[in-house]
Amino acid sequence: MAVLPKRNADRTEHSSLPIAQLILLTAAVLAVSAGSVSPTLSWNIIGLATATILTGLLITTENRARHRLLPAGAFRITTALGALYATMSLLAVAVTSGEIFVPLFLQVLHHQSPLVAGYLAALMAAGWTLGSIASSGVSGKGIKCAILAGPILGAAGMVALTVLMRTESDGGWMSLTPICIGLIAIGLGVGLAWPHLLTRVFQVASAGEQDLAAASITTVQLFATALGAALAGMVANVAGLSDPGGIAGTSSAAAWLFGVFALAPIIGVFTALRVVRFHSKNGESHKASRNRSRSDITS
């Protein structure tokens, strides 16, 4: 005689798709994308304003919805989960914003062939892989250092590219090497922090929301990537990539793009500090619980 396990009520409740939130999320990205196509500043502002309103509606709908898109507390920076999602999003935005236009900048400003420019742009991905491998075995204080190193290296790389990428060169290795180091630094930072940020999402999610937390990681990453790409196009367009275009327009676009999006990892330093603080508090509480358990056993 077999006894079937009891059905998990939480899992059943979250089985339906959060259609309203998905529509609002998609519409917010499309609003920024539509605004970025126009070279007119007013249309860019309208696109951003529309995306902001739609994001606000998304948060309101999510807080009231029966079927959630993200775990509880995901939209509040004061919670451990909110700080984690914010840090992940800011790192993803930094990588995406640079990755899209780096091949173009290298071709126009540094006279590289499309093939070479593509390989050099892939240095971000190589740095990400290297960072993930390097930080995979760390524990204790090493985890905190890896999480903080992510946005710090990202900010350093973005600031360096703000200065280096905009200056036209003959494409020699003397001028390309510092740019390559900046690209690697951005990817390396994300790679160092990312595995531990993912682990923390599972650790801080409430007991009935582990499955939702697992699914939400991809949702947050893709949303941040799409939004970062749309915003990058908007900044580059406004900065002169299309008008006046050429060397002058591309140089201006490179300076503005990396300068504006350097703010993402800089803000990420502060959200990463919150992640580390929450991690320390949880560690202390677990240690206190173990000590109480040992005291009860000995008594």
Predicted features along the sequence, with ranges:
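Hydrophobic transmembrane-helix bundles of small-molecule transporters
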Residues: 1-86, 94
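Context-gated lysine
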Residues: 6, 141-144, 281, 287
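Glutamate identity and glutamate-enriched acidic tracts
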Residues: 13, 62, 99, 168, ...
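Alpha-helical and His/Cys-centered functional microenvironments
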Residues: 25, 225, 290
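12-transmembrane solute porter fold
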Residues: 43, 67-242, 247-279
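Actinobacteria-biased recognition of intrinsically disordered, low-complexity terminal regions
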Residues: 268-299
